[in-house]
C-alpha cells in the first residue's frame, strides 16, 4: 500500500495534529461528509487551523452558522468548497455544452425531477440511520427533500444554463403521516433571461 494513511480518534485530534505540520506536509483538504448538524464545528475548526475544506451540502443547518463560516473563510483566506457532486458527472457537462452552445435555442422552460422512493414510506422507523437524521429537523435543518434534494436541481439548473434565479417560489409538503420534515418539494423559478423553471 503506497499511501501513507494516518488515522485519528476524532476530528479535533486530526486538526491539532495537522495544524502542527508545515503546509506542504498537511492533508490537502478536510472532507466533511457528516450529517448536516455536524458540519459547522469541524468546518470552523479546520478553517481556523488553515486547513482547506470540502463540505457536503447543505453548508450548515442555520443561516447564522453559514454566515460565520463565510466570514471565517474570507478572513483566513482558506480554500472552501460545498459539494454539488452531480456537476462533475459527464451528463451534466454534456448538457451544459449543448444548452450553452445555443443548439437548442433560447432557454424558455426547464423541467427537473429528482425522485427518491425512500421518502414514500417511514424509512426512519425501519432502522435506516440515514433516514432517521434526514427527517429530524434538529439534525437535518429546516427541510428534508427541498434542502437535501432540491438544492441539486437548482444548482444543476444554474450550471447547465448559465442563468441565475431571479425569483423562486417553493412549496414544501409532507405526505407521510407523522413525519416532521417535507417529503415533497416543488419550486417555480423565474430565470435571469425571463425563462421559467
Predicted regions mapped to residue ranges:
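A short helix-to-beta-strand connector/capping loop
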Residues: 1-6, 75-79
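Beta-loop-alpha module in the N-terminal Rossmann-like domain of NAD(P)-dependent dehydrogenases
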Residues: 5-72
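Rossmann-like NAD(P)(H) cofactor-binding subdomain of soluble oxidoreductases
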Residues: 38, 58, 81-87
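Hydrophobic residues in well-ordered beta-strands that form the structural core
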Residues: 55, 61, 80-82, 111
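Predominantly a Rossmann-like dinucleotide-binding segment in NAD(P)-dependent oxidoreductases
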Residues: 79, 86-178
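A short, glycine/Asx- and small/polar-enriched loop/turn
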Residues: 180-184
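Active-site beta-strand termini and strand-to-loop segments that position acidic
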Residues: 187-194
Amino acid at each position: 500500500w503506497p499511501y501513507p494513511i494516518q488515522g485519528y480518534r476524532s476530528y479535533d485530534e486530526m486538526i491539532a495534529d495537522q495544524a502542527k505540520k508545515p503546509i506542504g506536509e498537511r492533508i490537502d483538504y478536510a472532507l466533511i461528509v457528516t450529517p448536516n448538524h455536524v458540519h459547522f464545528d469541524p468546518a470552523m475548526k479546520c478553517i481556523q487551523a488553515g486547513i482547506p475544506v470540502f463540505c457536503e451540502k447543505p453548508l450548515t443547518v442555520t443561516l447564522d452558522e453559514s454566515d460565520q463560516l463565510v466570514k471565517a473563510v474570507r478572513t483566513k483566506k482558506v480554500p472552501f468548497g460545498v459539494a454539488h457532486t452531480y456537476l462533475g458527472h459527464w451528463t451534466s457537462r454534456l448538457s451544459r455544452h449543448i444548452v450553452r452552445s445555443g443548439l437548442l435555442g433560447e432557454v424558455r422552460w426547464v423541467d427537473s425531477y429528482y425522485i427518491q422512493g425512500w421518502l414514500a414510506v417511514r424509512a426512519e422507523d425501519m432502522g435506516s440511520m440515514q433516514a432517521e437524521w434526514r427527517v429530524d429537523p434538529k439534525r437535518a435543518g429546516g427541510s428534508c427533500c427541498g434542502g437535501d434534494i432540491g438544492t441539486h436541481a437548482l444548482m444543476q439548473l444554474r450550471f447547465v444554463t448559465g442563468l441565475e434565479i431571479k425569483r423562486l417560489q417553493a412549496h414544501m409538503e409532507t405526505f407521510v403521516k407523522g413525519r416532521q420534515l417535507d417529503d415533497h418539494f416543488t419550486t417555480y423559478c423565474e430565470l435571469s433571461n425571463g425563462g421559467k423553471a
